[in-house]
């Protein structure tokens, strides 16, 4: 299968298009695909554009110091820099603009790919002893467990941290 795809990366497309060798290689590579692609092959027509709604003038939300400290403690992310605060304000502003989009009469999706036929793999029964295989995915293990970074330790306030300019 890899050899069939290598031809696409090593040759110029103009040299391949229309040649019988290209068609044979493409058909061979296509026949080697085991699962159907999840990417839609045709774009879906939109009923209305949401871009004008999303391009309204920005109104940056006012975020007080207490809220920033709470978010830092919950997310373990340092938001003391002006760049981080600006990104946070932009994200909140974008989310508030999304809330204004009219969704009346729009059926909810179960998945973004619900118009595509998704092939399932074969259901293979095994003995279930996959612990060593699963633990190989972990960066750090202790005995027979995954080791995750602690999520409940709050960030310490640094002496040299700059206050946020409002």
Curated annotation (Swiss-Prot):
GO cellular component entries: glutamyl-tRNA(Gln) amidotransferase complex; mitochondrion
Transit sequence range: 1-44
Main location class: mitochondrion
Localization annotation: Mitochondrion
Catalysis performed (reactions): L-glutamyl-tRNA(Gln) + L-glutamine + ATP + H2O = L-glutaminyl-tRNA(Gln) + L-glutamate + ADP + phosphate + H(+)
Keywords linked to the UniProt accession: ATP-binding, Ligase, Mitochondrion, Nucleotide-binding, Protein biosynthesis, Transit peptide
Enzyme class: ligase
EC identifiers of the protein: 6.3.5.-
Alphabetical list of InterPro entries matching this protein: Asp/Glu-ADT_sf_sub_c, GatC
Task of the protein: Allows the formation of correctly charged Gln-tRNA(Gln) through the transamidation of misacylated Glu-tRNA(Gln) in the mitochondria. The reaction takes place in the presence of glutamine and ATP through an activated gamma-phospho-Glu-tRNA(Gln).
Subunit record text: Subunit of the heterotrimeric GatCAB amidotransferase (AdT) complex, composed of A, B and C subunits.
Protein name (database record): Glutamyl-tRNA(Gln) amidotransferase subunit C, mitochondrial
Organism (species): Anopheles darlingi
Species classification: Eukaryota, Metazoa, Ecdysozoa, Arthropoda, Hexapoda
